[in-house]
UniProtKB/Swiss-Prot annotation:
Keywords: Fatty acid metabolism, Isomerase, Lipid degradation, Lipid metabolism, Lyase, Multifunctional enzyme, NAD, Oxidoreductase. One of its GO terms (cellular component) is fatty acid beta-oxidation multienzyme complex. Residues 311-729 are annotated as: 3-hydroxyacyl-CoA dehydrogenase. It comes from Escherichia coli (strain SE11). Residues 1-189 are annotated as: Enoyl-CoA hydratase/isomerase. It catalyses: a (3S)-3-hydroxyacyl-CoA + NAD(+) = a 3-oxoacyl-CoA + NADH + H(+); a (3S)-3-hydroxyacyl-CoA = a (2E)-enoyl-CoA + H2O; a 4-saturated-(3S)-3-hydroxyacyl-CoA = a (3E)-enoyl-CoA + H2O; (3S)-3-hydroxybutanoyl-CoA = (3R)-3-hydroxybutanoyl-CoA. HAMAP family: FadB. Involved in the aerobic and anaerobic degradation of long-chain fatty acids via beta-oxidation cycle. Catalyzes the formation of 3-oxoacyl-CoA from enoyl-CoA via L-3-hydroxyacyl-CoA. It can also use D-3-hydroxyacyl-CoA and cis-3-enoyl-CoA as substrate. GO terms for molecular function: 3-hydroxybutyryl-CoA epimerase activity; delta(3)-delta(2)-enoyl-CoA isomerase activity; enoyl-CoA hydratase activity; long-chain-3-hydroxyacyl-CoA dehydrogenase activity; NAD+ binding. NCBIfam families: FadB, PRK11730.1. This is Fatty acid oxidation complex subunit alpha. The record marks 119, 139 as: Important for catalytic activity.
Amino acid sequence: MLYKGDTLYLDWLEDGIAELVFDAPGSVNKLDTATVASLGEAIGVLEQQSDLKGLLLRSNKAAFIVGADITEFLSLFLVPEEQLSQWLHFANSVFNRLEDLPVPTIAAANGYALGGGCECVLATDYRLATPDLRIGLPETKLGIMPGFGGSVRMPRMLGADSALEIIAAGKDVGADQALKIGLVDGVVKAEKLVEGAKAVLRQAINGDLDWKAKRQPKLEPLKLSKIEATMSFTIAKGMVAQTAGKHYPAPITAVKTIEAAARFGREEALNLENKSFVPLAHTNEARALVGIFLNDQYVKGKAKKLTKDVETPKQAAVLGAGIMGGGIAYQSAWKGVPVVMKDINDKSLTLGMTEAAKLLNKQLERGKIDGLKLAGVISTIHPTLDYAGFDRVDVVVEAVVENPKVKKAVLAETEQKVRPDTVLASNTSTIPISELANALERPENFCGMHFFNPVHRMPLVEIIRGEKSSDETIAKVVAWASKMGKTPIVVNDCPGFFVNRVLFPYFAGFSQLLRDGADFRKIDKVMEKQFGWPMGPAYLLDVVGIDTAHHAQAVMAAGFPQRMQKDYRDAIDALFDANRFGQKNGLGFWRYKEDSKGKPKKEEDAAVEDLLAEVSQPKRDFSEEEIIARMMIPMVNEVVRCLEEGIIATPAEADMALVYGLGFPPFHGGAFRWLDTLGSAKYLDMAQQYQHLGPLYEVPEGLRNKARHNEPYYPPVEPARLVGDLKTA
């Protein structure tokens, strides 16, 4: 053994060839700060070996290196700029020394080589992959950019266009695509990976392969003519501006850095990468996006822990076809759980099957499946007008009309047709689960399962625990949701549960702004362009359906009369009374016409102004700051109340539910991350300016207490203690 660290070791393999093996104690290899330092020590040992002829890098895990240790990022981002820059210089000196070894090097990569793992691979002369490899640089998705030389080496290896596409979008590619673009040099079966890598090294050692020529382009300026450079970088900047926008500075920073570094050799190019990385690491956007990644891991880990002792349902059923039922049936069948879809109406069944077939055909058009797979999936959805097959199902989700009487009748009837251990769930969006449970003989086998539309796209499923729902029931439904590829978050029961409960105060803020003379177009523009929502409140209401919102608003008002009962007729009432239901009937805040692709396109409609004039004061202008404050304060207050009341268990789950269920702007990280970034005292000052608008603007006591003590909702993070010889970097 030449060297043994905590996460890697170095040993002779054969005849002057050494192997450096990443072998962390856990299930995966991560390139954390300690591993970078250990890698530097191992390379130091290699530099002393006079009989070294070649080096092979590999992993003892199912994945090469999954990336940097993202759990370190938030503390790393708190390190002062100068110190962080110094550490990056040290880390890059390690990869430079790997790249500069006086012998040929090869990385044998399997599973994943992402982020720092990819950058480690880029520092070797040759790269051999297994067919399951995913390789790429996802850093821009976390609000940063490659910091271990990825933005320098990849463009010089692949050419600017392919590298820019991967780096700016934070993409990873499979082994075949990596081979095609030159990111790897060969793809071999897993069992032949090490032998194949040794064979390449022997060829390089024997002079059959010119490893020095292979290495040289990575040390030099990017080979691009002035015209080629102008075209590549202009197109890339245009694409990034269009897709990422101003709220995500990392992609455009990465492109501009690669452009600026193009005319320099490795050392100066790495300095430019360093200078760009450090300021990005100190942005609120980076903290928010890393926070989302960590919260996502937490939520998925919680679901995994919850379901470790239950069997995932093998057969499911959906009550109520149509678009929603068809969407649920498709998602279940697509992920391998056969489903019976029941309705009392043949027309609805046809609609449900058509929806499932349409979604499968889209997969076929994209080349994700072939005709055989399509037929196989569709054959596992069984439409029925009766209860045939219900004696075999493990879980049933009810997705009928949003009416408590109808839902209770359907659930009570279904309970008599299934096994005693079958779990029932309701896809209600607002009706309390404990109320629906009153109709059942086995309420412990019942809970809520709230999907979001469109089912195949929206990642969140709210699992609602009723007063009598058993732990096993919750676990089974969480297991099914996870199997369907969704992110399940368990919440406690109340009108609207979590997501709709916090959405309707936001809509109330919108209605009050309209009442006070604001223009709905400006509100939408501000909430989309400035705050970052995917759609403004007026457009969102049109998409959700004015009739749906009108009904839900009444349910919420009955559930929380002190805050949500209004004493005036609002814009939602006015549009509902005029039969303007939004996209579903072509008239809402806008008029809708189908474009060439059959998608609804919004157009101005003068008639809506007369309707809104009935419920609004004369038009007046509001500042962007006031619009954002008046829209967001009611929502954030309600989010905090849900945490204080135990409706949602943690800030992490609340923020993920908002991001995955409502499209809360990811660069804000969710309501609690936004609160922590803003500071609770500053938020309190802002909210107090609008307390005169009513109870929705009154800040909960728990949040006032946080403001008094200057406490965040997320646990405070200490700056990282960086490992490595920074002075000699």
